[in-house]
Amino acid sequence: MAKTTKQKIILTAKILGVCLLLLIIAAFVFRDALLQKAITHITHKMERDYNSDFSIKKAQFEGFNGLAMEGILLVPKHADTLLQIETIQTKVNFWQLFAGNIQLGSLHAKNGFLQLVKTKDGRNFDAFLPKKDTVDTGEKPNYAKLVYRILNKGLNLVPTDMHLENLSLRMNDMGKKATLHLNTLVLVDKQIESAIAVHTNTFSQRWKIKGFADPRNKQTDIRFFNIDTGKIKVPYFDERYGIHSSFDSIRLNVSNIDMDGGELHVDGFTSITNFTINHPKIANKDVVIKKARFDYNFLFGENFVAIDSSSTVHLNQMKFHPYVSYNNETDKIYTLKATIPKMKAQDFITSLPEGLFRHFEGMEASGNFDYRLNLIFNKNKPNALVFDSELNKENLVITKYGEANLSKLNGEFMYMPLSMMCRNVVFM
C-alpha cells in the first residue's frame, strides 16, 4: 500500500515536471508573439490612462533571456516628448522571473533623453504623477514589509552589468533650463564610474560618480565630485528659488539592508564636504559647513519608522545622537530625541555653520557641557506633550564675546519692534 502511494507521488511529480517543461517550451516558442501582445497592451494603456502615445519601432528576444528594443518613444498628447531612447538591450534572470520577480542581469542603453517641461499650458508629465487616493480602506501599512518590497524591486532593476551612453535628463521650467547629460556610465565587477556634463542658463560643469555598487548584496559606496576645479554647483535652484548652493563632494555608503524579526534595518553613512548655501532668508552671507557626516541606522517596523539612537551626526568637531520616530500602533506619536555627549564648549562654537549664527562668530568659551532633548507629541492627545531639555555645565564660562556683545543686555539699549516706534528698554 505504501509502495502504491509512493508510486503515485512519483508519477504526479513526473506529470507536473513534464507540464512545466511543456509550458516553458511553449513560452519560448511563442515568446515573440507574447512580446508583441504585451507592447500592444502597454500602448493601449498609455493612451487610455495617461493620454499619451507610446511606441517601439522594433522589439525582439535575443538568445535565451535577452531582449532588444529600438526606437522607444513616449509623447503625451499636445505636449513635448517625455521619453525617447534609440536602443536598449537587456538580459533578465530567468529563474527569478519564475519566482515572480523581474531581475535584470545586464542593461545596455544609448542615445536618449527624459524631458520634463513646464509651460503656461501645463506640464508634460502631469498625467504620470501619482493621484491622491481619496478612498480610506482603514488598513494600516506594514512599514517594514512595504519598504523592503520597494527596495527589493528597485535593486532588482539595477543590473550587475550596465553600460549607458549619451543619455540626458532635460528640465525646462518656464525657460529655466537645466540639462544633465550622462556621457557614460559603466558598472562592471561591482565597480561603477560615470561622466556627467551639466549645462544651465548660469553655468556649465563636469561631474563624476565613482565607487562600489553591489545591487544583489544590497551594498554600495559611491563618491560624487567635480572633474573641473571648484565646487559642484546645484542646478535649477539658483534660478527657481534664488538659492545658490555648492559642495566639494558627497559620499554615500549603504552597508546593510536586512529584514530580521519583522523589522527592517538599513545602515550606512553619508557625508559632504565644504557645503555652501546662500539665500537672503537664511543669512546675509554664505553659510558654510566644512565637514558633515551622518552615520545612519534606519529602523522600520510594522507600526513605526525610526532613525535609531545608535545613529550619529558629525558636524565639524561636534557630534550628537538623534532619535526620530513615527509610531501609529494606537495613536499617531512623533518622537524627537537628541543627545550631545560631553564636549568642549569652544569646539561646539567653532563647529557651528559659518555665517548662520553670526553672533557666535569670534566668541570664545572654556569648560565643558552635555545636552539632552526629549520631545514626544501625540497628535491624538496634544495636551499630553512631553518636552524635556537638559543642559549640564562643567566650568562653562564665556571668556570673549563675538560680533554681538551680549553684556549689553544688562544695560540700556535701543529696541525697535516691527510694529511699534523706537523706545528705550531697561533691563533691571
Report each predicted region and the residues it spans.
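Flexible beta-edge/linker motif
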Residues: 58-130, 141-170, 190, 195-223, ...
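N-terminal type II signal-anchor transmembrane helix
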Residues: 2-51, 283
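Interface amphipathic segments
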Residues: 81, 99-102, 178-253, 261, ...
